[in-house]
């Protein structure tokens, strides 16, 4: 009977998206291709190609509602990560793609006529996925373009933001992972 209850509990967790992270229950979800609903938490890199570093549980709600801006004075703007969700005039190099006439905000997303937000993987595919053209950028001083795969894009975006926050607020050092601190974010591959 006990085994049956455990099986039913496990199946219920799978069906509702409840998972256990380090012994704590949390609601996590797969990242849909596009959505008008902000997730609480998503798991990035479920298909990580690294033999050392695995997935990254990412708390979207915390990053989008707390004072996580570089200077700590406000919340992050949606376009800090969802960079295509702003007007073309607002884009800063090397960004080129714009998919909105207004800057994405939580209020704009809640509007009845708002377009859904696309997932990163819509453009930034996993290395080796040739189903679409992966964006590239040639950085100043470089001759070879960098292919902005999903992994490269996440690392650039997350690391640059974290490093800038640590530089702006030295008290964060050791509390917020920087570019060289992999395991605070990544689960080790077992």
Task: Give the role of each language-model region.
Residues 1-4:
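Positively charged n-region of N-terminal signal peptides that target proteins for export
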Residues 7-17:
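Bacterial N-terminal signal peptides
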Residues 11, 21-22, 105:
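Compositionally biased, intrinsically disordered low-complexity segments
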Residues 17-18, 24-28:
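Boundary at the C-terminal end of the N-terminal hydrophobic targeting segment
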Residues 18-19, 91:
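Residue-level signature of transmembrane alpha-helix interfaces in integral membrane proteins
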Residues 26-115, 121-125, 129-174:
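Sequence context of c-type cytochrome heme-c attachment sites
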Residues 178-189:
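Short, low-complexity, Pro/Ser/Thr/Gly-rich segments in the mature regions of secreted, periplasmic
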């Amino acid at each position: 009977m006990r085994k049956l209850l455990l099986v039913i509990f496990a199946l219920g967790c799978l069906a509702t998206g409840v998972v256990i992270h380090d012994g704590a229950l949390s609601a996590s979800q797969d990242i849909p291709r596009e959505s008008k609903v902000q997730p609480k938490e998503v798991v990035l890199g479920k298909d990580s190609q690294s033999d050392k570093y695995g997935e990254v549980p990412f708390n979207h709600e915390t990053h989008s509602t707390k004072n996580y801006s570089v200077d700590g004075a406000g919340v992050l703007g949606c376009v800090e990560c969802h960079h295509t969700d702003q007007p073309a005039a607002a884009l800063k190099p090397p960004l080129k793609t714009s998919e909105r006439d207004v800057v994405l905000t939580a209020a704009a997303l809640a509007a009845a006529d708002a377009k859904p937000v696309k997932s990163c993987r819509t453009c930034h595919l996993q290395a080796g996925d040739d189903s679409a053209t992966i964006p590239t950028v040639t950085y100043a001083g470089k001759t070879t373009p960098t292919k902005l795969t999903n992994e490269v894009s996440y690392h650039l975006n997350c690391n640059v933001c974290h490093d800038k926050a640590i530089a702006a607020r030295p008290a964060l050092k050791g509390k917020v992972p920087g570019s060289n601190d992999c395991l605070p974010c990544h689960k080790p591959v077992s």
